[in-house]
Amino acid sequence: MRFVLSFIFLIASSLSVAAHKIPAFTGPDFTGVYQCTGLDMHEGEYKGKVTLKLKKEHSQAQYGSYDFLLEVPGYGRYPGHMAANGLSAAMHFALENQSTHDFGTGISQFSKNAKGQWQFHKFYFEPQFKGGNSGFEDCVKQ
């Protein structure tokens, strides 16, 4: 009887582990450095650089997790993170100097240009920067 119970427990345990297996990441990898041009509704036109790094240990199936860093000369560094679902992604970013409340969330769509480079178009919203703000960025992987 003890053998039968042990066998049933072993089978049940293996089925439980198999049911929770995380699928491997199969989505596109957007890792790299992107040159960007932007239009901020308060600050006007700007240029910047975005660095994305895939966090494979936190990615699965078509869902990608990334470290995100936007660097804008004259303004500073905006570290954050990005979550992607196929070619769509959302980003959160915040200026390292938190006194200006310059932080926000963006949504973007990735595609490849005629040269085969990844690019994305982003809309962002900053709820507390200068009473609220939004803007756009277009970025191309270098």
Language-model-derived ranges and their functions:
Residues L5-S14:
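Bacterial N-terminal signal peptides
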Residues H20-Q142:
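Central antiparallel beta-sheet cores of small beta-barrel/beta-sandwich binding domains
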